[in-house]
């Protein structure tokens, strides 16, 4: 095999994928080269950034696109609407910072102390200015990602075999963190309101706490339901955790994406010192600026004893380019880029909610208060096409050694086959996720319209059969 095989394959995917996408989003779509040129002018007239031009991610080992092609087959997926990262060209301030550092062609060890000081200055200023949270240097630790930070914290507070509280449906990655920390899940269902939104069930939460419960992973804004938890919600849940000596691990990675008229309340901002001291907050630039592959995050706490316990379990081997990318992100230009993106995403969630509820038969959703993720209830449609029977039939006849599939995975396959759109199957988000799919709208409006129109065509065709 040629040593250039991988590069050739990626080049093919880039050209084929982008040509297909641009050809589908509207008449007169530019060629690949023209699209790249258009994308280069990221900030145009009036200081506005261009989020409308689809940006090619095919052939870059993207989980959202290339992994789905690997799983479902070449040409199977036209639009990836699953994994939680954004499709936009990076903020120019990030790209410039990375290009400048690449000009210095040496990649030796980085001074971790100096790097942490730089990251702290940017992050603490950002959190104080935008969210009113003051972070002291002694309260702040840089890590290689929210997952490594959570795993170290779980190992510090939850002995092997003990339980960790999760309010479900919740981010599926938490279950991997529990596996890595040798702990067990304790799902607590969120209440479902009449309009399809969700609320905390405080009585059920407290009843689930036992002598083996040491930690609770809070997701705020909540992935995948889109809740921005109120101060009252957080105070009540914080009181329960403090009463039962359950440590709060607050994952607030989606906090920069909040819909108009909604509010994100940091757990660290609560007006009760004892509750705040019983918590650790985890954040990163990865969701806000599309930096997941750069592997840099941080956590902080007002409780020195908690941090000392975590440090014993934690080691962060960080990389130079992750640091540089974050410096470019947390700049005045980066902040303006993000402000415009948040407004753009808010328009996407409004558009998508209206479209789903009016044009996708048998599917319901609601506009999220935060995140760029939407939680789609396919119950009526899934029961109509018989996904439970599909799963039972498949599992009865599947090849030996192959894993069993859930009804949500059968729906995932059905949508790929009939709409060429990939959504995340709901079964992995914990209890209360039956017949649900997660959709990411962190993409160009044209790409979003393509995905939704594909879904509408497929679902209406199936419904009329």
Label every PLM stretch briefly.
Residues 1-21:
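N-terminal secretory signal peptides and thylakoid transit peptides that target proteins
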Residues 44-145, 152, 330-332, 462-465:
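N-terminal small-domain helix-loop-helix segment of the aminotransferase-like
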Residues 156-178:
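Conserved PLP-anchoring active-site segment centered on the Schiff-base-forming lysine
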Residues 181, 243-244, 419:
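Helix C-cap/helix->beta junction micro-motif
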Residues 192-262:
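Active-site phosphate-binding strand-loop segment of PLP-dependent enzymes
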Residues 278-358, 363-370:
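PLP-dependent aminotransferase class I/II
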Residues 344-353, 365-381, 387-396, 433:
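Conserved glycine-rich beta-strand-loop-beta hairpin in the small C-terminal domain of fold type I
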Residues 391-398, 402-465:
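PLP-dependent enzyme catalytic core of the Aspartate aminotransferase-like
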């Amino acid at each position: 095999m040629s040593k250039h095989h991988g590069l050739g394959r990626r080049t093919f995917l880039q050209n084929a994928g982008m040509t297909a996408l641009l050809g589908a989003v509207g008449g007169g779509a530019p060629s690949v080269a023209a699209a790249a040129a258009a994308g280069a002018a990221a900030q145009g007239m009036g200081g506005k950034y261009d989020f409308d031009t689809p940006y090619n991610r095919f052939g870059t080992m993207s989980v959202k696109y290339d992994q789905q092609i690997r799983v479902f087959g070449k040409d199977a997926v036209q639009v990836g609407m699953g994994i939680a990262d954004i499709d936009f060209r990076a903020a120019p301030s990030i790209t410039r910072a990375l290009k400048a550092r690449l000009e210095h062609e040496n990649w030796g060890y980085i001074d971790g102390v100096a790097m942490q000081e730089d990251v702290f200055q940017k992050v603490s200023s950002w959190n104080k200015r935008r969210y009113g949270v003051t972070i002291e240097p002694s309260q702040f630790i840089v890590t290689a990602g929210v997952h490594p930070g959570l795993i170290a914290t779980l190992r510090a507070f939850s002995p092997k075999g003990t339980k960790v509280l999760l309010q479900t449906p919740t981010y599926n990655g938490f279950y991997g963190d529990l596996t890595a920390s040798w702990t067990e899940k304790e799902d607590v269902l969120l209440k479902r309101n009449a309009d399809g939104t969700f609320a905390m069930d405080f009585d059920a939460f407290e009843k689930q706490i036992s002598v083996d419960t040491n930690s609770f992973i809070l997701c705020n804004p909540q992935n995948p339901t889109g809740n921005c938890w109120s101060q009252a919600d957080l105070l009540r849940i914080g009181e329960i955790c403090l009463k039962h000596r359950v440590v709060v691990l607050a994952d607030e990675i989606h906090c920069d994406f909040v819909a108009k008229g909604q509010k994100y309340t940091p757990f660290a901002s609560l007006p009760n010192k004892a509750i705040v001291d019983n918590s650790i907050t985890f954040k990163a630039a990865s969701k806000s600026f599309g930096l997941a592959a750069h592997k840099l995050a941080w956590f902080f706490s007002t409780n020195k004893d908690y941090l000392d316990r975590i440090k014993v379990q934690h080691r962060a081997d960080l990389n130079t380019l992750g640091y540089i990318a974050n410096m470019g992100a947390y700049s005045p230009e980066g902040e303006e880029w993000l402000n415009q993106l948040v407004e753009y995403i808010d328009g996407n969630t409004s558009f998508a909610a209206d479209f789903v509820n009016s044009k996708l038969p048998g599917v319901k959703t609601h506009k999220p208060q935060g995140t760029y993720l939407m939680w789609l209830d396919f119950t009526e449609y899934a029961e109509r096409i018989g996904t439970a029977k599909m799963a039972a039939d498949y599992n009865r006849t599947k090849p030996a050694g192959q894993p069993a599939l859930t009804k949500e995975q059968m729906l995932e396959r059905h949508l790929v086959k009939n709409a060429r759109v990939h959504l995340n199957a709901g079964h992995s988000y914990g209890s209360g996720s039956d017949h649900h799919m997660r959709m990411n709208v962190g993409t160009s409006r044209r790409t979003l319209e393509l995905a939704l129109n594909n879904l509408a065509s497929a679902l209406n065709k199936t419904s009329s059969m």
